């Protein structure tokens, strides 16, 4: 005899529960001494497009759905989609461009495997603007960033996670998640 649900599936209720679970996983990893940054009215949002990290996936090559473009739409800034491994020239040009913005948001996607992404984050941190870095997959990307960088981990590269991160960056919601790993170098850096 087949099992029958006690009540019909409610797609809206399931979507709301999914959103609550996603928002509960957004994790604040590092808060600079100056606190959560005020990114201002025109932040520069940068990062690479989503790409397939394994042999399975339905990745659509759509720059409009890239983290920087989606984040810029949420925050009212400008979005620039970089290469997965930005060149030194691209990094220098973005650092120059960031000087004219009110703040910076950078999304990393496996930056621990693509060190040029972390080089970009460090170059942008040196500009001196309020800055936030968001790991869109693994939190390892965040451990080597300078002290002045506010860091969050979203664990996924989706429109929903980008909206949740934007709410945290605007101060509309908290980042209650917990980091599931400990990194000795990061712990030592935090103790200093």
PLM segments and residue spans:
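Preference for extracellular/luminal or secreted protein segments
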Residues: 1-192
């Amino acid at each position: 005899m087949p099992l029958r649900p006690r009540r019909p599936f409610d797609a809206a209720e399931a979507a709301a529960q999914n959103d609550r679970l996603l928002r509960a996983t957004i994790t604040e990893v590092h808060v600079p001494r100056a606190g959560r940054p005020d990114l201002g009215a025109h932040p520069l949002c940068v990062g690479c497009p989503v790409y397939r990290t394994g042999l399975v996936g339905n990745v659509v090559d759509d720059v409009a759905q890239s983290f920087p473009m989606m984040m810029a739409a949420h925050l009212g800034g400008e979005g620039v989609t970089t290469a997965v491994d930005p060149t030194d020239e691209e990094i220098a040009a973005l650092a120059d461009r960031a000087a004219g913005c009110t703040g910076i948001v950078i999304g990393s996607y496996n930056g621990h495997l693509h060190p040029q992404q972390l080089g970009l984050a460090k170059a942008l941190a040196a500009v001196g603007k309020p800055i936030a870095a968001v790991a869109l997959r693994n939190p390892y990307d965040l451990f080597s960033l300078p002290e002045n960088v506010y860091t969050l981990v979203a664990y996924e590269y989706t429109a929903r996670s980008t909206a949740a991160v934007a709410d945290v960056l605007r101060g509309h919601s908290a980042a209650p998640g917990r980091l599931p790993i400990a990194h000795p170098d990061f712990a030592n850096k935090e103790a200093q």
